[in-house]
């Protein structure tokens, strides 16, 4: 029952507190470790495709395994001192592995700036949560970027860590976060990371394969619960879920596009380079700032569905 209560408590902590700036966050430490490992390995290994592949593979092995070992040992030691301490640590880390409240807050900030008509401020706000270049985005482009981020991060920021913590508590959830953080920092297909980031990207693809598909199905159900188009979500997901270079990224994006009746994705600039990405969904209407709020409601609805279903399954397996 430890994992049951840790997951429930962690979910409630995230819903109530999000990620307070005064509380050290494991992902920040992971990012520092990735940067340090990258710097050391790039210096130590030959600057060739083979050398960069080897360096990237080393990071992709050391960080997840190290995270699992350190967090697992910490949870074990805390539980040995007192069961309540072990549970509290697991709750804290489970809460920090989830990003529902933070995602909703950041995307709502984008909506607020758009609602005020302050496009430069909206661009700055959306730049906090997307990887693309934002300085030349129109209001529709800013809205589209925010909606896409809510949809995609509903999978890797909520559903995936929730699934892994249900399977293995906080240590497994944070191990997943280590993999996801590696991908966000190294998994680019540009000159700098084409080889060094390849293992991180492939490992992230594998870790997200099942969660992203579960998240898409839950999004269809969430669309029905929130008054959006479940039929559209199902239809566009079935049609467009593979319209992305990543096997996972278009899963929830396509369901979201169909639920809202808008078109997402399409060409974008990353670090000054133009990427001709395919569009997802049909433009049944023009996207509007309130679609950010609609996407948030569906994200919260699918999060609650995942929690209830996951805890129910966990309870049945324990009893």
Positions of predicted regions on the chain:
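Hydrophobic alpha-helical transmembrane segments
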Residues: 1-175, 179, 187-319
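Glycine-rich phosphate/dinucleotide-binding loop and adjoining beta-alpha-beta core of small-molecule
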Residues: 184
